[in-house]
Amino acid sequence: MVLSPADKTNVKAAWGKVGAHAGEYGAEALERMFLSFPTTKTYFPHFDLSHGSAQVKGHGKKVADALTNAVAHVDDMPNALSALSDLHAHKLRVDPVNFKLLSHCLLVTLAAHLPAEFTPAVHASLDKFLASVSTVLTSKYR
């Protein structure tokens, strides 16, 4: 999915508002995903998945850091996320549908925390951005 210049501006502005809360929001999105889509827990059998778990917080920070990297390299996401794509495709073997589920939960989390900034245009831009990230992460499955 191609991001327009307006989409890129919206994504960078919205992610800038996330700022220091990125890890917290990443963990919250993971918790939402685990509660809403319990089958996603199968990829984390070694994690304590309870609310506030240090492992979920740690992985939430990893998710947020990867998204921060994608925002910073929005014009070259395939190269920026190449190692992460390899990891998820070849080692972790995560079903690609799970990226869509996490993206949805992240959008809900951002809407809850940033209601003033989460306009329809920003929502659409973030949705396109997360779809692009998902596409890049699943590109090495083929």
Curated annotation (Swiss-Prot):
Q: What is the effect of changing residue 49 to R?
A: In Montgomery
Reported impact of residue 95 to A = In Bassett; markedly reduced oxygen affinity
Reported effect of changing residue 73 to R? Answer: In Daneskgah-Teheran
Q: Where does O2 bind?
A: 59
Domain of life of the native organism: Eukaryota
Q: What outcome follows a substitution of residue 116 to D? A: In J-Tongariki
Consequence when changing residue 32 to S: In Prato; unstable
Effect of mutating residue 57 to R: In Port Huron
Q: What is the effect of changing residue 134 to R?
A: In Val de Marne; O(2) affinity up and
Phenotype for residue 41 to M: In Kanagawa; O(2) affinity up
The consequence of residue 63 to M is: In Evans; unstable
Cite a single GO BP annotation. response to hydrogen peroxide
Documented effect of changing residue 98 to K: In Dallas; O(2) affinity up
Q: Output the InterPro entries linked to this UniProt entry.
A: Globin, Globin-like_sf, Globin/Proto, Hemoglobin_a-typ, Hemoglobin_oxygen_transport, Hemoglobin_pi
Specify the effect of residue 16 to R: In Ottawa/Siam
The listed outcome for residue 137 to P is: In Bibba; unstable; causes alpha-thalassemia
Which consequence is recorded for altering residue 45 to L?
A: In Milledgeville; O(2) affinity up and
Q: Which residues carry this modification: N6-succinyllysine?
A: 8, 12, 17, 41
- Binding residues annotated for heme b, in chain numbering: 88
How is the subunit organization of this protein annotated in UniProt? Answer: Heterotetramer of two alpha chains and two beta chains in adult hemoglobin A (HbA); two alpha chains and two delta chains in adult hemoglobin A2 (HbA2); two alpha chains and two epsilon chains in early embryonic hemoglobin Gower-2; two alpha chains and two gamma chains in fetal hemoglobin F (HbF).
The disease this record links to the protein is: Heinz body anemias: Form of non-spherocytic hemolytic anemia of Dacie type 1. After splenectomy, which has little benefit, basophilic inclusions called Heinz bodies are demonstrable in the erythrocytes. Before splenectomy, diffuse or punctate basophilia may be evident. Most of these cases are probably instances of hemoglobinopathy. The hemoglobin demonstrates heat lability. Heinz bodies are observed also with the Ivemark syndrome (asplenia with cardiovascular anomalies) and with glutathione peroxidase deficiency. Alpha-thalassemia: A form of thalassemia. Thalassemias are common monogenic diseases occurring mostly in Mediterranean and Southeast Asian populations. The hallmark of alpha-thalassemia is an imbalance in globin-chain production in the adult HbA molecule. The level of alpha chain production can range from none to very nearly normal levels. Deletion of both copies of each of the two alpha-globin genes causes alpha(0)-thalassemia, also known as homozygous alpha thalassemia.
Under which name does UniProt file this protein? Answer: Hemoglobin subunit alpha
What taxonomic classification does the UniProt entry list for its organism? Eukaryota, Metazoa, Chordata, Craniata, Vertebrata
Q: Which gene encodes it?
A: HBA1
